[in-house]
């Protein structure tokens, strides 16, 4: 009887998907590279490279990180780089580098920076965003400057004082003249001999924007999920002195410090595996060699499909942005007029998520519209999303 139950259970496992085996409901990701949905789907060639790495034996991890870091730095035109467990880890480690420099005793104290001469980072108040917390994980204190609608170079310079270790900068690629630009922040950092730490998580396209941003900071963080690497990966790059400090405070530096009898740094939780490391360099090589005009044409065809089918429905207005793509997202916006349809964007989102399979989209324009990131959608999924929206508004 026990054997029969085991066989039956095995058959049920075989007949169901891997997520369903554990009671998890898979759905369609129409948001893009969002952390809440798992971030990315590495292309087959990236998966193959990762599988080969995991099945080809073991390596000395420091050597793996340094040699792959050489490839990353060479590709981006920077002095040094290494793979991290996401962009947030790179931001945190980069901040730790700005705080400790090459002082191994300070590395052993972080995140307790109360005894440090410098433990503050200036940060434009108008750049307030979800991930500014990552700059404080290593013990830095953010000093917010300027206003919600802008900040001048003079205001930033006036905020730089004896406790200032650096400038925390969120690079979205879209800051206007009312803000201190990344170039102006670089000039101030040089003038006052402080560090520029840049969160450039999604600034991976155009390619010249990718390399330019990588080269401007003392430490720059990128999210590797945006180039087709696993969700849990990132890149820390920039000036050798500070990237090396970040490296020594990473998980591998923690292990090395113990072997050398030094104070252990704080970065032990930021671990990567060898498959992830190879996934990043394989994805980076693919990203810099692929035909991006073809990639964008494919994504444009997906956006056009939404416009072609849905824009003729009364009360539905589809907007396909015409500005050149900056960053990872290729989005189409769909507005729903409650006066005509009897429902708005929030209700459409709710019904899409409650369907089978659930479809996850982004709210836009205070809920009156939805945003659909097409870069993670297959052609079949595009048709499914269009069909479901049509059914909801009909």
Predicted regions and their residues:
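Non-catalytic C-terminal accessory modules of carbohydrate-active enzymes
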Residues: 299-300
